[in-house]
Regions:
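Intrinsically disordered, low-complexity regions enriched in Ser/Pro/Gly/Gln/His and often acidic
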Residues: 7, 23, 65, 73, ...
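Long, compositionally biased intrinsically disordered terminal regions
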Residues: 11-12, 120-197
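Short aromatic/hydrophobic-glycine micro-motifs
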Residues: 45, 101-102, 149, 170
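Acidic, low-complexity intrinsically disordered regions
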Residues: 10, 26, 57, 68, ...
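Short, intrinsically disordered low-complexity segments
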Residues: 51-132
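N-terminal "first-domain core" detector
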Residues: 5-51
C-alpha cells in the first residue's frame, strides 16, 4: 500500500500537542481503518459509554495516571484512524493491527522516562521499535528512509517526538493541526476486565 501525499505540517508538531494539554503524557495510536466504531469494538470498549464529543469535552477525562482506560477514537485521514488514550496505561496494539492493518503507537510520559519510542505493528505482530534508548528498527527503517526522517539526530525528547510525528504525517497523509485537533471523535471507556482471561 502506498502512502498518501502529505500536506505541509505545522513545523513543531509536539509543541502544538503539548500546548493543548498533553505535556505530562501523550499516548497516541494511528491504525489503518475507516470505522471508529469497529476499532472501539476490537478494543472491547463499553458501547454504553459512547460519547460523541469535541476535543474540549474529551479533555475533561484527561487523567494520564489513572487506571481507568478512556480513549478518544476518530478518523485521522482517509483509511486511517487515530486513538488518543486520555486515561489509563494504553491500548494493546496486537488486536487492532490484525488482518494486515498497519499500526503505529507513540507514547510520551514526562514522569516515566520521557519518550517511549515509536512502535510499528502489522498483522498482530511487532514489526519495529525505535527510540533513543532502544532500537530494533525492523520495517521502520524503510519508512524512515523513504520519508527522509532522521530520528538519530534527535538530541532531546522534543526533537525525538517531532521526528516521529513528522514520519506519521508522511505515512498517513495528514499532520496534526488545529483542524485535526478540533475534529469531533468518540469517547469510550474500556472496562477493567475487558482483557481479563
Amino acid at each position: 500500500m502506498t502512502d498518501n501525499v502529505s500536506p505541509s505540517p505545522i513545523e513543531d508538531q509536539w509543541e502544538f500537542l503539548s500546548s493543548h494539554g498533553f505535556s505530562a503524557r501523550f499516548a497516541g495510536t494511528w491504525v489503518e481503518g475507516s470505522d471508529p466504531e469497529s476499532a472501539a469494538h476490537i478494543l472491547r470498549a463499553d458501547p454504553a459509554s459512547r460519547l460523541d464529543c469535541d476535543f474540549e469535552t474529551a479533555m475533561q477525562w484527561y487523567d494520564p495516571y489513572s487506571s481507568e482506560e478512556i480513549v478518544w477514537v476518530g478518523v485521522h485521514a482517509p483509511e486511517w484512524l487515530h486513538i488518543i488514550s486520555l486515561s489509563g496505561v494504553g491500548i494493546a496494539p496486537g488486536p487492532l493491527s490484525a488482518d494486515g492493518r498497519r499500526l503505529f503507537y507513540l507514547e510520551y510520559d514526562d514522569g516515566e522516562g520521557g519518550v517511549h519510542g515509536l512502535s510499528y505493528w502489522r498483522d498482530g505482530k511487532s514489526r519495529g521499535q525505535y527510540g533513543r534508548n532502544s532500537n530494533t528498527l525492523g520495517e521502520l527503517e524503510v519508512l524512515f528512509n523513504r520519508h527522509n526522517v532522521d530520528a538519530t539526530a534527535a538530541q532531546d525528547d522534543e526533537s525525538e517526538l517531532n521526528s516521529y510525528l513528522h514520519l506519521l504525517g508522511h505515512v498517513t497523509g495528514r499532520f496534526i493541526d488545529q483542524d485535526w485537533l478540533m475534529s469531533p471523535r468518540t469517547l469510550y471507556r474500556i472496562p477493567d476486565d475487558a482483557w481479563s482471561w
